[in-house]
Amino acid sequence: NLQPSDPADEAAGLAFNLTQPVARPGNPDTLTSLLNSILNLSAVRMVDLDASNLERYGLAQPKYLLELVTLTGKEVLIRIGDSAGNGQYYVTSTALPAIMTVQADALTAVDLPLTDYVDRFVALMSIWKVSSVSLDLEGEQHELGLSVEEGQKITDETVELTLDGQDAKIISQSGENLFSTFYQTLIGIRIDGFDLAASPDGPVTSRITYTLKPDPASQSDAKALVIEFVSRDAYTDYVLIDGSYTGFYVSHRDTFTSGQVGQEGLLVAVSQLQYAIDHAVDGVFDTSKGYPAIS
């Protein structure tokens, strides 16, 4: 489902939402490329003006079936069938009911994995929309407190940031806000793949609960957003949001245990933030000295 952010404003760009096989915000870069490649398809050669013999060209059961619906309700169906050789594919459409070929490289954006079409961030939460976050990371409990209003800088004096009740407004020797670094790790959890047939029924191993502020714009009350993780195998975890399976999973290492510098998992990142709080001098922690290894 592709729709303009504001149908009355052509300059507003496009907002993309997928409804099948999963309901997710779309990746605007990939889907813009997909849409442009479809709209700009041009025939290399005309093969048959009679489009009744679809089976001969692999178009009766096409590799790809693309349905475009305009804002006025007009529908165009595009079928992409067998290879025609020479780097081309057979194509037909309801807009031009004939058999033609198109260049295969014009269809690059059509043949991508599902992960490329979706917004891969599990829950990208703006910091000013959140009042607190409860973390249960494999049994390790933490509580984040946030007092940031839209338009404020995280370094403003009136902003309060806490980890388990401690002042967490710690900066590095270069001025980097270490709470902000941790928060980016928290909201930066990314989808690793899809398992649409799964029905996770194992125990929840980790949980992230965001408490969201009331939103006057949408007239919504304060509410909780609960993200839960259930082990899929030794390497990945299913993701549930507000108790419902999302259809996707994440890398356990990337999400929780990675010690790679700049790509730390949550268990490592929260330990580093606590270490910085414990060893900061006048609110400054020298990250160049490093952190202790996390066992």
What are these model-derived regions, one by one?
Residues 1-295:
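Soluble, acidic/polar mature domains that operate outside membranes
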